[in-house]
Structures are given as C-alpha cells and as structure tokens.
C-alpha cells in the first residue's frame, strides 16, 4: 500500500532569512537552496520582489534566481507585493509567485496600511498577469489563529479571505499562525471553516512554533486532510512579536513527525540535516562579522 504523501513547502530562504538582522550573502543563499533541493525538497520559496527599502535582506533575489540549478518537477516560488514585483519575478524566471493578505483588519492596516478588501483588490492585476503568463499563483493568509492587535480571529474571517484568494486565481492558500498562539482545537476549527469554501487539497498550513505547539497543530490538521505544510530549515526566522522566541517550525521536525506517522515526504533526513548545519554555521559567521567567502560551499 502506497503511503499518503504530504508536500513540504520550504520557506526558509525567504520567510526565514528575511527576518535576519544581518544581510546574508548571495553565495550562502544559493548554497542553502542547492542543499535543500538535494534533500528532496522541490517546493522552495527562494526570495521576494519587495522593495529593498522595506526588506533589504531580499534585494539580491534576482541574483539568487540566476544561479539556481534546474528543479524538474518542482517550483521555485517568490513573494510579490504588486504588479511591478510580479513583472520582476517573471523576468527572473519564477516558477510560482505568491501574494498575501491578512485575516485581521488591524494587522492588515499595521502591516500594509490598507484594509483586507483593499489589499485583495490591489492583487487583482497581479492575479490577472499571472494567469496570462501561465505562472501559478499561491496565496498566504496571516494571523489565522490570532492577531497581536485584535487577539482572537474568527474561522469565518479566515475562510472568507481564503475564498477571495482562490477566486482571484490562487491554486493554493497557505494559512499562517503568524504569532504562533494557536491550539490544535483552534487549528481544526480554522481548517474546517476554510475547507467548507475551498477544497482541502488547496489548503496549506504555515505554523509558527512560538509557544511550542506547531507540531501538534499540524498533526491535528493532517487528520482533516491537509496535505501541504510550510516549514523552514533549522527553524529559520524568529517571531517579531516575541523577541527570542521560535518562529517558523523547523523542516527537520516536520519531516521527522511525518515520517513517524507513516506519511511520505520524499525528504532525505541526512541531506536535510546537512542543509541545516550549513545555514546555521554560515549565519553564525555572518552575525559575528566574519568573512564567509571561504565558507564551505
């Protein structure tokens, strides 16, 4: 009997490294992505085309993409904030572009200075351009299990944003517990609400491990049919709302949990550990101000 397959979307090179207080050299980013690919991870978010003034850590995304090895059967994804970012991503050869919205009005206004409805309207031209260029479009929804400003977020609010993203043309919607406050019961309620308006096959889960419940939340949602999980190698990326606390759940932990549950991921644990060791070692040198040009590549 063939094991049920769960696809891990590796977000470390973008969502993880963009939160670093230092600029990570292009060589390190490329070396990390090469190792992730060798570990069997074929869905990799490699960067973003957001203004360098806002996210300087991602300013070299075009240079990173120009050096990436072929990814047959997989996709290199990038985050885009607007049509200008999309055009840059297309020119760089992105295999997928991602757009983002919030399930919390307060977070939307604090993060991108507009309402949820306005943010979705702004992405309509991006969705149209992606459709015309036959580039797959992914959607992110933040604060699905809690907001740093509003507190509790209702599942129905999450479902409506997810529905709108799919209506725009997103083939997949990733639901993010941005501040890592969710519980398994809350996660199940959220997935159930979204699955009522979006096919569960198009739902991904993006958990942060701020309070140590990410794996429990993922496990609860797997039982409801979720088959796509976002994670970051070595748990890259902290939580901006809880300094010093973990952010993204570690890919190593997710892969081990799925393997123990008898679920197939296609990930080689030893190669994944090598990728984690590579990036943590490189980051330690960068943070210390050391030259990484001779770092093992």
Question: Model-flagged regions — what are they?
Answer:
Residues 1-297:
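Catalytic cores and adjacent flexible loops of soluble metabolic enzymes
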């Amino acid at each position: 009997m063939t094991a049920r397959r769960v696809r891990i979307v590796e977000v470390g090179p973008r969502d993880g490294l963009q939160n670093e207080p230092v600029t990570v050299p292009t060589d390190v980013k490329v070396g990390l992505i090469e190792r992730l690919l060798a570990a069997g991870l074929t869905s990799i978010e490699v960067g973003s085309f957001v203004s360098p003034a806002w996210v300087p850590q991602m300013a070299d995304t075009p240079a990173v993409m120009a050096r990436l090895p072929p990814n047959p059967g997989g996709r290199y994804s990038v985050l885009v904030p607007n049509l200008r970012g999309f055009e840059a991503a297309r020119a760089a050869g992105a295999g997928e572009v991602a757009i983002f919205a919030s399930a919390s009005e307060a977070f939307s206004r604090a993060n991108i200075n507009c309402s949820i409805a306005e943010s979705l309207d702004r992405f309509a031209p991006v969705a149209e351009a992606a459709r015309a260029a036959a580039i797959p479009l992914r959607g992110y929804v933040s604060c699905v299990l809690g907001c740093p400003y509003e507190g509790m977020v209702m599942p129905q609010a999450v479902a409506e944003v997810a529905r709108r993203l799919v209506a725009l043309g997103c083939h997949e919607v990733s639901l993010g517990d941005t501040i890592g406050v969710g519980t398994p019961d809350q996660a199940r309620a959220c997935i159930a609400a979204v699955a009522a308006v979006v096919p569960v096959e198009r739902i991904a889960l993006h958990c942060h491990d701020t309070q140590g419940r990410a794996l429990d939340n993922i496990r609860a949602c797997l039982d409801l049919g979720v088959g796509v999980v976002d994670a970051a190698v070595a748990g890259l990326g902290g939580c901006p709302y809880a300094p010093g606390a973990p952010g993204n759940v570690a890919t190593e932990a997710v892969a081990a949990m799925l393997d123990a549950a008898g679920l197939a991921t296609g990930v080689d644990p030893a190669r994944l550990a090598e990728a984690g060791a590579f990036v943590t070692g490189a980051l330690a040198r960068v943070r210390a101000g050391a030259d990484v040009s001779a770092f093992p590549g």
